[in-house]
């Protein structure tokens, strides 16, 4: 159970990034799944694009284990608030 929108988005991005479901493209897929989730939930395309750009370096750090899920949640909340 994820109590709020940001928690759901965080889990979606983190789970896809860390699952290694694909040989290549897990980070890109996690970002684009997040963008799609934003769009499905009524966010404007411009805001979703901002999310995608902002998440590029963050996704790399998540994959490299430099950022955990809790820190990712904080960063996502910040990105959504800007």
Task: Give a label for each model feature.
Residues 1-82:
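FIC/Doc superfamily catalytic core
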């Amino acid at each position: 159970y994820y109590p709020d929108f940001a928690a759901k988005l965080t889990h979606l991005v983190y789970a896809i990034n860390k699952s290694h479901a694909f040989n290549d493209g897990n980070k890109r897929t996690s970002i684009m799944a997040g963008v799609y989730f934003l769009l499905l939930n009524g966010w404007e395309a411009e805001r979703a694009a901002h999310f995608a750009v902002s998440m590029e370096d963050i996704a790399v750090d998540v994959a490299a284990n430099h950022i955990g899920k809790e820190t990712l949640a904080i960063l996502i909340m910040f990105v959504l608030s800007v």
